[in-house]
Each structure stands twice: as structure tokens, then as C-alpha cells.
């Protein structure tokens, strides 16, 4: 009866005991932190890697993606930026692949929407002349005869860029806005053993550790500008123009928006002051409403005045009809702007989250702004305002 005592165990049980006794950190190596896909400069990728394809034994890349942003570049690869490149991005929230080489030139969209703020597992695999795209374990795209042999390339180098393009977006087969307000984690890029270089762009990328919700977040001092010529135009008879803001979070004091030109004080402005929303004009009078977060804030502009309303509260600001500098004349000036956030030169402490901004009922996209601060979260907001939300890209 040797080996049948109370301490005797089968080999399988001994392995289970060892696994249970190991510290948790030994059971799984800690994952590196998630990386935000917006670079500090707002231009180009966050990481560029090169690989010697003569040494590659693995021709797939996988990662997890989380975003509320429906459009942007996730991954780009090439052996020649003019003649042989590949791009994986989002358009309308769904994956899109663009391929440009001597074998195939195509743009294909496939798969489910990924802009829901959840983590999604994505894998891109090249098998000979085939490309496979898998999302959350399900194959959503199989492209055949789209690649030639790597051995035919003049240089044995494959370049991978994460979160951007090494050339202008106009050079894509179907241009899109490259900046993607999203996070990537657990990335495995081609064959690590064949990697010859890796470079991360300078600057402090935004943290992915903050829980987010859909919207657009302006940290203190952030600003964006839209040309009035690029916005939906006012109704002609009678003249009317509307702006609607979904103000979800707000703190501090400073401008929310203004109408005017860069070289002059604004004709009309909306500010945060002491938990109030204050509407001011260049003609002196102003009015205010108590700040109510979550309730739509609406500005209705007419020739005779401006109506500010939020929920049941409504105030009307009268405007002079004969002034040549009236609001109506702004729309015929080529440099007239809709300013969001801090005005040029303003030391503002206001930070706020918009879950939407509409001009004449049409939602505006921060990626389409004439110019903007790079620390604006274009398609996401923190769940609450605090010190950890003032980070920049």
C-alpha cells in the first residue's frame, strides 16, 4: 500500500496545487498599460516599428481596441509608401481595409460597429496572398489574391504604424480623418523576433485609465474653431440660426462658445460663471440662467434678438436692428468663426463635456474643426471631472 498515505497525490493534482500556491503575478505577466491612439502633436502615428521580413515567422497582428470614435486609422503597414501599403481603420464605426499594391487596389468595409466604448479583440492575418480580419473571435473578412510574395520587394523591410499615417490622408484610396480617439492594449505586432526598430513619438499621450462616455471634452484652456461658411447656413426669411449644446459636465469659469472674428471681440458669447450660464453681446446687455447639467441648452438667433433656453427657463436678449456690426453681417465675412472653449489669449479655467453640438439641427464633428487644441477629447468624455482628466494628448 505504498504511496497511499494522506499526503500522496496524483501528478495532475500536484500540478494544480502548485498553480494555486503560485502568487497571482507569477500566474500571468502583467499587461503593459493601454496606449491612446492620439499622438502629442496630433499628427501621425503614436508608434512606428520596422521588421526584417526575411526573418519573420509570424505574419499576423492582434490587439484590443476601445473607442467611441466612428472614424480614424488604427493600423498601417507598408514596404513602400507609394507602391505597397495597407491600412486598417474605422469608417462609420465599422472596420475598413484599404490595400494598394501591384496585385490589388481596393477599399473594403466589413464587420460590426466597434465604436461602442467596449473592448474588442481584433486580429489581422496574412497567409500567402490572403488577408483575414477577425473581430471578437469571428472572421468578418477574407480577401483572396491581394498580396504578392514578400521576396519580390526591393528592400526586406516591413513598416508598421499604429494610430496614424506616414503620409497625408489625401493619399489614401478613400480619404478619412486619421485621428482616432481610442485606446489599444495587448498589442502583438507581427514577429517580435524579426523587429529591427521601434519608435514612439515624443510627448505625453492621453491616459487610457480614465473611464469614459461618448461626447467631446474640453480641458481648461482648450479651444476649437469652425468657419461660419462651413456650417449649415441660416434661414433667410425670416433670418434665423440655432445652436444646441448638450452640456453633460462643467466646472470652472470661462467661455463655452462665441461668434465673431479672430481679430475682434466676439459679437455674442456664452460663458460659465459661478454655476450660471451667461449670455453677453457686443452691445452691452447680458442675461443668465442657472446651470442645469444634462438639459439641452439652446440659442436661437433672430434679427431682433437672441433666445437662450434650457428646459422650462427662457430669456431673450434684444439686439439693435440698425447696427452695421450686427450678427447678420457676420455671415458675409470670410473670417467669421464659431469659437468653442477658451478664446485666443484667454486664461480660462472652464472645463466641460458636450454630448453633442448642433448647428441648424446638424451635429458638428470636432474632427472637422478648422483648427482645435490637441488636448480636446474629440469623441469621449470622462465620467466625472477631476485632476486626472486634464491630461493632454
Curated annotation (Swiss-Prot):
Keyword rRNA processing recorded: no
Pfam families cross-referenced by the UniProt entry: Laminin_G_1
GO molecular function terms attached to this record: steroid binding
Residue ranges of domain Laminin G-like in the record: 35-208, 215-381
Superkingdom of origin organism: Eukaryota
Compartments where found: Secreted
Key word Signal present: yes
Location, primary (coarse class): secreted
Glycosylation sites: 371, 387
Subunit structure: Homodimer.
Annotated function: Functions as an androgen transport protein, but may also be involved in receptor mediated processes. Each dimer binds one molecule of steroid. Specific for 5-alpha-dihydrotestosterone, testosterone, and 17-beta-estradiol. Regulates the plasma metabolic clearance rate of steroid hormones by controlling their plasma concentration.
Name of the featured protein: Sex hormone-binding globulin
Lineage per the UniProt record: Eukaryota, Metazoa, Chordata, Craniata, Vertebrata
